[in-house]
């Protein structure tokens, strides 16, 4: 794997290779000394041109646990704020010694443009590009679901996909790169994905995606989902009114206490105890109630922890793809 740009690029075998490698990395993360020499002498640049907490810190931790040198770059205080182009920025970073560029960018398609441009020889990892994709978030979500499934079935994790799992993704699909990446990846791994959102928050062309669409969250909850993934409303990307009010959105599309109680009282298609997922940050009281956010059924912090292992796997595979992992 030379780059990681989109989950749509990943075959089932590719996705399982990342998840299986991440399991080996997770074993390292349980040690007292959480280090591997896999990327010693390599330089990873975190080029974040949009704000981030979880993803940036997770990639930094992942690279350092693989013994890489890490350079963190943000637009604020750099020449980007003076109008420097992406081409000049990345060529400067490669001249400094970047072997991999982990990039978050406000423009959809920016990561693929960089990888295909010939501007640099560095590996490119998409850490989120506009409303397009966020592949490592989808991979860590799949990793989390696979672990839950293995715990429920007692089966070996290695080589296991998500066949038969039912996952509902709820909320602002229109502006969500997480939703797009999850639809492609989860369907590739055999899961049944349903999008639940008002028509105003669904993108044009969604009917062609490998998923089902419903305009009723309550109907989606009645279909015995194994996981319900709540998405925040991305008000910063909205130029107009996409729903009447915050209160109306919560009543219709929020995981309220009543809906959460219904979810936890039932069983999923494969999991006896369905889970709530959230990529963060959570807007408590809007898309998710405080009780649901704080429940042990909420895997948000589990997802964050798993993200380090998954990103270790991704960095290893794009930079050392011809070598075996040795935990």
Curated annotation (Swiss-Prot):
SUPFAM superfamilies with a match to the protein in the record: Aspartate/ornithine carbamoyltransferase
Keywords of this entry: Pyrimidine biosynthesis, Transferase
Cited Pfam families: OTCace (PF00185), OTCace_N (PF02729)
EC numbers, comma separated: 2.1.3.2
InterPro entries: Asp/Orn_carbamoyltranf_P-bd, Asp/Orn_carbamoylTrfase, Asp/Orn_carbamoylTrfase_sf, Asp_carbamoyltransf, Asp_carbamoyltransf_Asp/Orn-bd
Class of enzymatic activity (EC top level): transferase
Stated name of the protein: Aspartate carbamoyltransferase catalytic subunit
Organism for this UniProt entry: Micrococcus luteus (strain ATCC 4698 / DSM 20030 / JCM 1464 / CCM 169 / CCUG 5858 / IAM 1056 / NBRC 3333 / NCIMB 9278 / NCTC 2665 / VKM Ac-2230) (Micrococcus lysodeikticus)
């Amino acid at each position: 794997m030379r780059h990681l740009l989109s989950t749509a690029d990943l075959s089932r075998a590719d996705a399982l290779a990342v998840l299986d490698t991440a399991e080996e990395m997770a074993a390292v993360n349980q040690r007292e000394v959480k280090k591997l020499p896999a990327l010693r002498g390599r330089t990873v640049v975190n080029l974040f041109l949009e704000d981030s907490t979880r993803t940036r810190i997770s990639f930094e931790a992942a690279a350092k646990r693989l013994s890489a040198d890490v350079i963190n770059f943000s637009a604020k205080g750099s020449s980007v704020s003076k109008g420097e182009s992406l081409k000049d920025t990345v060529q400067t970073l490669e001249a400094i010694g970047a072997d991999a560029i982990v990039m978050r960018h406000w423009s959809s398609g920016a990561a693929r443009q960089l990888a295909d441009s010939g501007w640099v020889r560095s590996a490119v990892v998409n850490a989120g590009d506009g409303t397009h994709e966020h592949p490592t978030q989808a991979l860590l979500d799949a990793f989390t679901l696979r672990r839950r499934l293995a715990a429920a079935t007692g089966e070996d994790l290695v080589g296991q996909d998500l066949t038969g799992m039912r996952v509902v993704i709820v909320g602002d699909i229109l502006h969500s790169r997480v939703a797009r990446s999850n639809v492609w990846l989860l369907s590739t791994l055999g899961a049944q994905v349903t999008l639940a959102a008002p028509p105003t928050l669904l993108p044009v062309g969604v009917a062609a995606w490998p998923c089902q669409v419903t305009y009723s969250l309550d109907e989606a909850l009645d279909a015995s989902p194994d996981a319900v993934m709540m998405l925040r409303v991305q008000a910063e990307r909205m130029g107009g009114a996409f729903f009447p009010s915050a209160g109306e959105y919560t009543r219709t599309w929020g995981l309220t206490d009543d809906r959460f109680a219904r979810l936890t009282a039932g069983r999923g298609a494969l999991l006896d105890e369905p889970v709530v997922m959230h990529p963060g940050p959570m807007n408590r009281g809007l898309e998710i109630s405080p009780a649901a956010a704080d429940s042990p059924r909420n895997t948000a912090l589990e997802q964050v922890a798993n993200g380090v292992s998954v990103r270790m796997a991704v960095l290893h595979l794009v930079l050392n793809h011809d070598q075996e992992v040795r935990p």
